[in-house]
């Protein structure tokens, strides 16, 4: 009996142990997880410390700055520009400080280098307003560049205008004038015959005026025609009608009154050209007697039929 009771008690203890084993295992697993979590946090902190140490030890890599171009004007040659860029030297001749200032303004710099300030001062005294405009920071670089281009173009344009004006002035001074106006070749040839002819032609102003105011073809006065026109003898030598026919057809019209008016003009000129002593030196214009007889013959011929008719009628009645 005691053995049976001991066996039953051992069986109950074994069952109790079997029931308590999962709970102990769960409790033990939680403790292990906590230990593992603590170990993980410690490892993370150590890794962060190592990374921070590495960052402190290795500074961040920076891009190497590009070398800026350096410009300088040599003291011995003020118009020579030297540029140093990436170890290479560039030398330019005949470069003024104004151009350097314009280039620096285009590159984004508003002031000249201190080494060039003293060299630009003499030019600033000559063109103070121009340099003040270039040194102003409130004006855009494009505006300054356009102003520089405009000034250069204006200088060239003014120079060309001065040259052309000087040449035209020399030509105008060499040309001959007549009554304040440029004389043409025809006038020059007519006036350059001989000084005696010029004095004779300019002796009487009335003859000159009367000759110019009459049409050379029909003798029409200047006051009797709308305008005097160009003819074969030159300008203002024909009346309006003769001038239009000459310009359109190239021929002069037939004027029956031209002979009569020409004789009248000749008599007027002979009366006007009287010597100071009161004696007329020109010959009188006498009509040709043949023309007179011919004209009378024509008149008689025209009148004969009428006379014959008048004479023949009474004879017929008498018979």
From Swiss-Prot:
Keyword annotations from UniProtKB, A to Z: Activator, DNA-binding, Metal-binding, Nucleus, Transcription, Transcription regulation, Zinc, Zinc-finger
Biased composition (Low complexity): 1-15
UniProt keyword RNA-binding present: no
Chain coiled-coil ranges: none
Segments forming domain CCT: 143-185
Induction annotation: By drought and salt stresses.
Residue ranges of the region described as Disordered: 1-74, 292-319
Pfam families hit by this protein: CCT, GATA, tify
Name used for this protein in its record: GATA transcription factor 18
Name of encoding gene: GATA18
């Amino acid at each position: 009996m005691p053995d049976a009771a001991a066996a039953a008690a051992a069986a109950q203890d074994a069952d109790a142990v079997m029931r308590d084993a999962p709970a102990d295992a769960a409790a033990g697993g939680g403790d292990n997880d906590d230990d593992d979590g603590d170990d993980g946090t410690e490892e993370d902190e150590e890794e962060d410390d190592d990374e921070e140490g590495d960052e402190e030890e290795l500074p961040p890599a920076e891009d190497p700055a590009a070398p800026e171009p350096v410009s300088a004007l040599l003291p011995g040659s003020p118009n020579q520009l030297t540029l140093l860029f990436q170890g290479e030297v560039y030398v330019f001749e005949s470069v003024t400080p104004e151009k350097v200032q314009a280039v620096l303004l285009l590159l984004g710099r508003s002031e000249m280098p201190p080494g060039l300030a003293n060299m630009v001062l003499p030019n600033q005294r000559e063109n103070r307003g121009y340099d003040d405009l270039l040194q102003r920071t409130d004006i855009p670089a494009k505006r300054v560049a356009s102003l520089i281009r405009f000034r250069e173009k204006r200088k060239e344009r003014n120079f060309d205008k001065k040259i052309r004006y000087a040449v035209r002035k020399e030509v105008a001074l060499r040309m001959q004038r007549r009554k304040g106006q440029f004389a043409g070749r025809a006038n020059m040839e007519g006036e350059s015959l001989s000084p005696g002819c010029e004095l004779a032609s300019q002796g009487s102003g009335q003859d000159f005026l009367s000759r110019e105011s009459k049409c050379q073809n029909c003798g029409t006065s200047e006051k009797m025609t709308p305008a005097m026109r160009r003819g074969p003898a030159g300008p203002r030598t024909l009346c309006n009608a003769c001038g239009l026919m000459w310009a359109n057809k190239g021929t002069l019209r037939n004027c029956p009154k031209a002979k009569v008016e020409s004789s009248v003009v000749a008599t007027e000129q002979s009366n006007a050209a009287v010597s100071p002593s009161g004696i007329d030196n020109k010959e009188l214009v006498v009509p040709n007697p043949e023309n007179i007889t011919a004209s009378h013959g024509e008149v008689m011929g025209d009148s004969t039929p009428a006379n014959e008719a008048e004479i023949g009628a009474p004879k017929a009645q008498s018979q």
